[in-house]
């Protein structure tokens, strides 16, 4: 094989310090199964919940949910390593003691399959920019904005895009008064402001439930957002940047959760998503063509409004008055049930092609200011 024919070396980075560690592992397992080994030389770097980087054996079978048991990157499961924040090192991953400084691998591009804080929020993107290593997905700004539900809504609203009503509790305040939320009406959803996978989310149907819901959310994030419940269909759309910088939007998907587990107040929570297999996912969604196209265009506008790059999943409610944007996920789930790859498959882009496009776009973009 000539130098021009050599495979692109991709580091799939997963796990991390957030409470979405396990879902990141499952996403990584799915990606490892679907990367084209003829084109890509793949290494797998796990980050433990404590933050140590470990070179793993890239076994996707170890990164699955089995009998409701969640996967985890464990200390001692491989050689500990680091990525020096030095662009002169050319993407080198070096060992930590013993053998400190030994170059273990050199990579061309990083696929940071990290969900939640300390990964999806601009932190690893900043490290990769400092290290001069191209990476899949949004840059520092869009990653940070997309992780914070408050600032996502603020930027979208400033660009004239439809968002729901909300209230925010920020440190050092410890309580959110009922009067601040009454304008939202009931029910409301109380969430960690910088989190995903529906972890720490509560549905509040009585104001007496608000303090407990805030306390639950604060176990995951000191900043809490309270969102007005929106009556409508839950729709999602994938946005994908091509290597030439053009943007494409996928067919839509719909999540239906009414009556899940026999509860009238059910919503698409963590257990429904990943453990119970209880929600119904329709891909493509059964939506009028004109409405679907309008939502796809809104997804592209939202992507541009936060200066996103690479990919994103934009979540909507379709109400009687039209679509409302709920949030933007700059590194959506890539599990076998995740909507993002399923929507692109329904659009005619299979999983290996989708992953290859993301990597090609990352290499074409490079690093630095754009």
UniProtKB/Swiss-Prot annotation:
- Enzyme Commission number(s) from the entry: 6.3.2.4
Location(s) in or outside the cell: Cytoplasm
Q: Which Pfam families match?
A: Dala_Dala_lig_C, Dala_Dala_lig_N
* Molecular function via GO: ATP binding; D-alanine-D-alanine ligase activity; metal ion binding
Quote the pathway field: Cell wall biogenesis; peptidoglycan biosynthesis
Q: How is the cofactor bound?
A: Binds 2 magnesium or manganese ions per subunit.
Q: Which reaction(s) are listed as its catalytic activity?
A: 2 D-alanine + ATP = D-alanyl-D-alanine + ADP + phosphate + H(+)
Q: Does the keyword Transmembrane apply?
A: no
Provide the alphabetized UniProt keywords: ATP-binding, Cell shape, Cell wall biogenesis/degradation, Cytoplasm, Ligase, Magnesium, Manganese, Metal-binding, Nucleotide-binding, Peptidoglycan synthesis
Residues noted as binding Mg(2+) 1 in the record, renumbered to the chain: 315, 327
Provide the binding site for ATP: 181-236
Q: List required co-factors.
A: Mg(2+); Mn(2+)
Q: Which residues form the ATP-grasp domain?
A: 153-360
* Keyword rRNA-binding among record annotations: no
In Swiss-Prot or TrEMBL terms, this protein is called D-alanine--D-alanine ligase
User: What is the organism of origin for this protein?
Assistant: Mycobacterium bovis (strain ATCC BAA-935 / AF2122/97)
């Amino acid at each position: 094989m000539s130098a021009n024919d050599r495979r692109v070396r991709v580091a799939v980075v997963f796990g991390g310090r957030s409470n979405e560690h396990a879902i990141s592992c499952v996403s990584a397992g799915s990606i490892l199964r679907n990367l084209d080994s003829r084109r890509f030389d793949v290494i797998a770097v796990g980050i433990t919940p404590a933050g140590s980087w470990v070179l793993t054996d890239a076994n996707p079978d170890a990164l699955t949910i089995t009998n409701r048991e969640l996967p985890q990157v464990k200390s001692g499961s491989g050689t500990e390593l680091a990525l020096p924040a030095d662009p002169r090192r050319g993407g080198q991953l070096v060992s930590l003691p013993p053998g400190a400084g030994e170059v273990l691998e050199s990579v061309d591009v990083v696929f940071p399959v990290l969900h939640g804080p300390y990964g999806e929020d601009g932190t690893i993107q900043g490290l990769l920019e400092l290290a001069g290593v191209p990476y899949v997905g949004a840059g520092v700004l869009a990653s940070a904005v997309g992780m914070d539900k408050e600032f996502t809504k603020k930027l979208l609203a400033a660009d004239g895009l439809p968002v729901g009503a909300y209230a925010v509790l920020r440190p050092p305040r410890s309580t959110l008064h009922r009067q601040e939320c009454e304008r939202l009406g009931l029910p409301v959803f109380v969430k960690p402001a910088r989190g995903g996978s529906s972890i720490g989310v509560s549905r509040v149907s009585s104001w007496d439930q608000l303090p407990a819901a805030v306390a639950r959310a604060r176990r995951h994030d000191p900043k809490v957002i309270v969102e007005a419940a929106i009556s409508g269909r839950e729709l999602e759309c994938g946005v994908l940047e091509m290597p030439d910088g053009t943007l494409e939007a996928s067919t839509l998907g719909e999540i239906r959760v009414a009556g899940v587990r026999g509860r009238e107040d059910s919503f698409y929570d963590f257990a429904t998503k990943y453990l119970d297999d209880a929600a119904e996912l329709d891909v493509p969604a059964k939506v009028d063509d004109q409405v679907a196209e309008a939502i796809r265009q809104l997804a592209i506008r939202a992507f541009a409004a936060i200066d996103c790059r690479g990919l994103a999943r934009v979540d909507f409610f379709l109400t009687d008055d039209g679509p409302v944007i709920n949030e933007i996920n700059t590194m959506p789930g890539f599990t076998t049930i995740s909507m993002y790859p399923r929507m692109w498959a329904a659009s005619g882009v299979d999983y290996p092609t989708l992953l290859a496009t993301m990597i090609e776009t990352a290499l074409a973009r490079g690093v630095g200011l754009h």
